[in-house]
Amino acid sequence: MSIILGIDPGSRVTGYGVIRQNGRHLQYLGSGCIRTSEKDLPGRLKQIYAGVTEIITQFQPDAFAIEQVFMAKNADSALKLGQARGAAIVSAVNHDLPVYEYAARLIKQAVVGTGGADKAQVQHMVQHMLKLPAKPQADAADALGVAICHANTNKTLIALAGQATSAKRGRYR
């Protein structure tokens, strides 16, 4: 059983989602958005760091999963996104959490079944998969999608490790 914190980074709005994975079962623990109010980027990064630190303290996750930077058309936006990711990652590292990064297409594939899914499809499937009474906010749904992607990846790795162990045992008998 593990608790996974998923992060959808942004310099103005950073989504977060927390789930508990118990084998194949996923349980929703919480989600929301860290909304920055500072005008300057360093102030916003400080708010992201503080917000992620507060979430880590509250939920005590075992793993930290974050969306990778995509190549935006605007280089300035991509740099700011990278800095927002950095602020969140530093908080995780300061709490000795393992950090996992996933591409947006892989996250959408894990949640919706296609890497080209839009935000509404991700929201719908996150609501369905976690049995939520209402659709989560878009940024929170994306963050929950990151956590779900990590849980699915983690399950696959555990299954593969089990197969490798079984195969190894078979060879030595």
From Swiss-Prot:
Mg(2+) 2 binds at E67. GO terms for biological process: DNA recombination; DNA repair. InterPro entries: RNaseH-like_sf (IPR012337), RNaseH_sf (IPR036397), X-over_junc_endoDNase_Mg_BS (IPR020563), X-over_junc_endoDNase_RuvC (IPR002176). PROSITE patterns: RUVC. It catalyses: Endonucleolytic cleavage at a junction such as a reciprocal single-stranded crossover between two homologous DNA duplexes (Holliday junction). Keywords: Cytoplasm, DNA damage, DNA recombination, DNA repair, DNA-binding, Endonuclease, Hydrolase, Magnesium, Metal-binding, Nuclease. It is an enzyme of class 3 (hydrolase). GO terms for molecular function: crossover junction DNA endonuclease activity; DNA binding; magnesium ion binding. Mg(2+) 1 binds at D8, D139. This is Crossover junction endodeoxyribonuclease RuvC. It comes from Vibrio vulnificus (strain CMCP6). The gene is ruvC.
